[in-house]
From Swiss-Prot:
<dbReference type="InterPro" id="IPR014031">
    <property type="entry name" value="Ketoacyl_synth_C"/>
</dbReference>
<keyword id="KW-0808">Transferase</keyword>
<keyword id="KW-0443">Lipid metabolism</keyword>
<keyword id="KW-0276">Fatty acid metabolism</keyword>
<dbReference type="InterPro" id="IPR000794">
    <property type="entry name" value="Beta-ketoacyl_synthase"/>
</dbReference>
<dbReference type="InterPro" id="IPR017568">
    <property type="entry name" value="3-oxoacyl-ACP_synth-2"/>
</dbReference>
<dbReference type="Pfam" id="PF00109">
    <property type="entry name" value="ketoacyl-synt"/>
</dbReference>
<comment type="pathway">
    <text>Lipid metabolism; fatty acid biosynthesis.</text>
</comment>
<dbReference type="Pfam" id="PF02801">
    <property type="entry name" value="Ketoacyl-synt_C"/>
</dbReference>
<keyword id="KW-0444">Lipid biosynthesis</keyword>
<feature type="active site" description="For beta-ketoacyl synthase activity">
    <location>
        <position position="304"/>
    </location>
</feature>
<feature type="active site" description="For beta-ketoacyl synthase activity">
    <location>
        <position position="342"/>
    </location>
</feature>
<keyword id="KW-0012">Acyltransferase</keyword>
<dbReference type="GO" id="GO:0004315">
    <property type="term" value="F:3-oxoacyl-[acyl-carrier-protein] synthase activity"/>
</dbReference>
<comment type="subunit">
    <text>Homodimer.</text>
</comment>
<dbReference type="InterPro" id="IPR020841">
    <property type="entry name" value="PKS_Beta-ketoAc_synthase_dom"/>
</dbReference>
<feature type="active site" description="For beta-ketoacyl synthase activity">
    <location>
        <position position="164"/>
    </location>
</feature>
Length: 414
């Protein structure tokens, strides 16, 4: 079966550095951090008291207050970014095409905040005080469910949940649905809102988070010798993907083409990556095979780069393994998590959008806080300042998750 070409025609984003793609991209190129102290609950007894938070979000721009009350914030974030993406794409949904337009939006954790408050109501006041909207306001597939209802999208409706690879996997699989004829367009990505007491306590107990409470904006420092864990982030990133001829026929604006998607498993450890980077390398190699490109053709890798001692080094080893010596010498690698923190299930889709924007504007965002780089890495990590490039045709985005689930996407400049 010959595959159909898939392109990106719309993008939407809520992130710790901006509530649109445009504002987020501008902040990232300027090297601005979105990490702040947590003030929406008492963090006195928490080992980490900061996160990458969405700021100034007004749900009523996207839905009624009545509907918002039935949704955890992760759903609201996902719908907001989804509506932004649909409006950006100019894709009109009608009776004739609705069954050919689908949704693939997931979350790594889901409605943690309302799970916490729902459990509290159960314990303190009994089962009759649990909201009748508890289940549909917290389960992972309800971004896709609500958005499809709001916009009349009757094509494939799925929500892949694969920890920190969620957003990327949803985009990759949505692209394949289009490529193999299951849909003509898909709204795809991920959303997360895990900066809750239980979320912060859980990741803190696992010793996964940075504890640099005196300097929150310097806490996320991928590949720096002084890194001490990741910074939790909230937000959503959504793309509208479309079959190329379908997009061209309606005169759509085309940002980039999705040319490669690869997946793999570490088969190594619950939370730590394979030390030699081989798991991530398998996903990158699969994406390059799918795209029909070599390592030397990849101009930029938006790395998973979470600022953990083990993960950062393993990923660079994987990049070098996948791209080869010649590819490693010329590729630029950066981690925008140095500015946004780690958005868990939204990370891969937010960073896929950033990867596309790097092709559109021929600009590579920096890795901030890289003051004392780990020795012997042997790749250009774009420290501190964004980099202007020329004639960059291909860029890759990596996402790796707990359980050893890995994904890579390759986009081509149009």
């Amino acid at each position: 079966m010959s595959k159909r070409r898939v392109v990106v025609t719309g993008m939407g984003m809520l992130s710790p550095v901006g509530n649109t793609v445009e504002s987020s991209w501008k902040a990232l190129l300027a090297g601005q951090s979105g990490i702040v102290n947590i003030e929406h609950f008492d963090t006195t007894n928490f080992s980490t008291r900061f996160a990458g938070l969405v700021k100034g979000f007004d749900c009523e721009q996207y839905m009624s207050k009545k509907d918002a009350r039935k949704m955890d914030l992760f759903i609201q974030y996902g719908i907001a970014a989804g509506i932004q993406a649909l409006e950006d794409s100019g894709l009109e949904v009608n009776e004739e095409n609705a069954a050919r337009i689908g949704v693939a939006i997931g979350s790594g954790i889901g409605g943690l905040e309302l799970i916490e408050t729902g459990h509290q109501a159960l314990i303190e006041k009994g089962p009759r005080k649990v909201s009748p909207f508890f289940v549909p306001s917290t389960i992972v597939n309800m971004i896709a469910g609500n958005l499809s209802i709001m916009r009349g999208l009757r094509g494939p409706n799925i929500a892949i949940s694969t920890a920190c690879t969620t957003g990327l996997h949803n985009i990759g699989h949505a692209a394949r649905m289009i490529a193999y004829g299951d849909a003509d367009a898909m709204v795809a990505g991920g959303a997360e809102k895990a900066s809750t007491p239980l979320g912060m306590a859980g990741f803190g107990a696992a010793k996964a988070l940075s504890t640099r409470n005196d300097e929150p904006q310097k806490a996320s420092r991928p590949w720096d010798k002084d890194r001490d864990g990741f910074v939790l982030g909230d937000g959503a990133g959504i793309m509208v993907l479309e079959e190329y001829e379908h997009a061209k026929a309606r005169g759509a604006k085309i940002y980039a083409e999705v040319v490669g998607f690869g997946m793999s498993g570490d088969a190594y450890h619950m939370t730590s990556p394979s030390e030699d980077g081989s798991g991530g390398a398998l996903a990158m190699e699969a994406a390059m095979r799918d795209a029909g490109v070599t390592g030397e053709q990849i101009g930029y890798v938006n790395a998973h780069g979470t600022s953990t001692p083990a993960g950062d080094v393993a990923e660079v080893k994987g990049i070098k393994r996948a791209l080869g010596e010649a590819g490693t010498k010329q590729v630029l690698v950066s981690s925008t998590k140095s500015m946004t923190g780690h958005l868990l299930g939204a990370a891969g889709s937010v960073e896929a959008i950033i990867t596309v924007m790097s092709l559109v504007d021929q600009m590579v965002p920096p890795t901030i806080n890289l003051d004392n780089p780990e020795e012997g890495l042997g790749v250009d990590l774009v420290p501190h300042v964004a980099r202007k490039v020329e004639s960059m045709e291909y860029a890759m985005c990596n996402s790796f998750g707990f359980g050893g689930t890995n994904g890579s996407l390759i986009f081509k400049r149009m």
